[in-house]
Design a protein with these regions (language model features):
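Metal-assisted phosphate- and nucleotidyl-transfer catalytic regions
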Residues: 216-333, 355-382, 423-425
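Class II aminoacyl-tRNA synthetase-like tRNA-binding/catalytic domains
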Residues: 2-208, 218, 292, 397, ...
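Short, glycine-/Ser/Thr-/acidic-enriched flexible segments
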Residues: 23, 160-162, 180-182, 201-204, ...
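Active-site pocket scaffolds in enzymes
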Residues: 346-425
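Generic beta-strand/beta-sheet core signal
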Residues: 32, 120-123, 303-306, 330-332, ...
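Hydrophobic, well-ordered secondary-structure elements that form the walls
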Residues: 303, 339, 391
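Short, well-ordered loop/turn and helix-capping segments at boundaries between secondary-structure elements
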Residues: 183, 205, 222, 247, ...
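Hydrophobic face of alpha-helices
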Residues: 105, 109, 113, 210-217, ...
Length: 425
């Protein structure tokens, strides 16, 4: 048997020679590695002792059902300590998560190659990460000209600006599997570093991107996955979601005073949450209290046509400029993808960034550099385009049936039983 074969794929009585970690359980001994977890049955007097717990071993024998009947075994090296931090705090096998991610990366690359996309790479260290009030970038200063000449910068929150610059240079269908960083809380669904699959179609409408997302997600969340999703995926507008969850028309309440009055009249939020002067803060409070719980009951759903103030990088809907060409895909309340019909007007984009900057100042948030290189590219000219970012970690969580990102991202931060943050790698 080669080391990459699976025990459960072998016929009974097949000869087995493999390696792994020896684990003592209340029921006996077990062998574990990234590919195999199986019970061991030792015959004769040559059996492991307590000191062999967690040792790396080589074993040989024959399979009988789910048990490996051991005829020979030897210790390669004994463990000098207990389970590592990498092993702690998870509920699924590490190997299962690693293999699922590798399989998804292969699936994604095959998916896009079949559709004439080109895989690209863009810098993770950037001068201007974007101005979004609700995203906190991770600072990263480098010293390109020596210790006395620091160059402040950031780890990108998304490869969006760089990929759009490639669209301005003539790229038409591009995708990227990117590691990105966003400062903020550590939760079951959030980690400061995570994986995004982002792609763009020049000269094509947003519906083409929505179709891509539907096909790729349904291929990944197939019938054998923990949470299958089948096409067609339902589509509803954000206006409809707010009507169903809150009982009012969000598009008639696009300024802070009007929305605050409506929220108070309908008693949708506690009084202290209504004190904010910012429309988007009121809206996101409604998201937490009402919209997210409602969306969680809808299964797999595309929420489209978001209010224009919530889409700084998206173009407005020509049929109703109160809304933007933006969608999000949710599965059982888990936000998976966020897509735009991309704004290409450089002056309008600058004005939106400047509005963001004023909003950051009003909230006491740090000022961020204006993305001048991106704006310069827009002035050069960007074709009408559509794009999306899909959260790979969350998609894998749904595929494997886990509620925590740590089960699919081995190095994700996590909190112990006392609520203390475990040190990062």
């Amino acid at each position: 048997m080669t080391d990459t074969q699976r025990l459960d794929r072998l016929p009974d009585c097949a000869s087995v020679q493999t390696r792994g970690r020896l684990v003592q359980t209340e029921h006996g001994w077990r062998l574990r590695n990234l590919h195999i977890t199986c019970d061991l049955a030792f015959s004769g007097g040559d059996r492991p002792a307590a000191r062999d717990h967690l040792a790396l071993v080589e074993v040989g024998g024959a399979r009988e059902g789910a048990v490996l009947q051991v005829s020979t075994w030897r210790v390669i090296t004994r463990a000098g300590s207990g389970p590592t931090r990498l092993s702690a705090g998870r509920t699924t096998e590490l190997g299962r998560a690693i293999e699922a991610r590798a399989a998804f990366n292969r699936r994604a690359r095959n998916f896009f190659e079949a559709r004439d996309f080109i895989e690209v790479e863009t810098p993770a260290w950037v001068r201007a990460p974007g101005t979004d009030v609700h995203l906190a970038p991770v600072g990263a200063t480098v010293h390109l000209d020596g210790a006395h000449h620091p160059r402040p910068g950031y780890l990108h929150t998304s490869p969006e600006f760089s990929m759009k610059r490639l669209l301005c240079e003539g790229a038409e269908r591009i995708y990227q599997l990117a590691r990105v960083w966003r400062d903020g809380e550590v939760t079951a669904r959030h980690n400061p570093e995570f994986s995004l699959l982002e792609w763009y179609r020049a000269w094509e409408p947003l519906d083409a991107i929505i179709d891509d997302v539907e096909q790729l997600v349904c291929q990944t969340l197939h019938a054998e996955s923990a949470r299958p999703v089948t096409a067609p995926i339902r589509r509803v507008t954000m206006q409809e979601v707010v009507w169903e969850a809150c009982g009012f028309d969000i598009l008639e309440n696009l300024n802070a005073d009007a929305l605050r009055e409506t929220v108070r009249r309908l008693e949708l939020l506690p009084p202290h949450l209504c004190e904010t002067p910012h429309w988007d803060d009121l809206f996101f409070a409604l998201v937490v209290e009402h919209l997210d719980p409602h969306i969680a009951t809808m299964g797999a759903v595309f929420v489209t046509d978001w209010p224009a103030p919530l889409a700084v990088l998206a173009r407005k809907n020509p049929d109703d400029p109160r809304t933007a060409e933006r969608f999000e895909l949710y599965v059982d309340g888990v936000e998976l993808a966020n897509g735009f019909g991309e704004l290409t007007d450089a002056q309008e984009q600058r004005e939106r960034f400047e509005e963001d900057a004023r909003a950051r100042e009003a909230r006491g948030l740090p000022a961020l550099p204006m993305p001048e290189a991106f704006l310069e590219a827009l002035r050069f000219g960007m074709p009408p385009s559509s794009g999306v970012a899909l959260g790979v970690d969350r998609l894998l969580m749904l595929q494997l049936g886990t509620d925590t990102i740590r089960d699919v991202a081995p190095f994700a931060l996590w909190r112990d039983e006392a609520g203390e943050l475990v040190d990062w790698p």
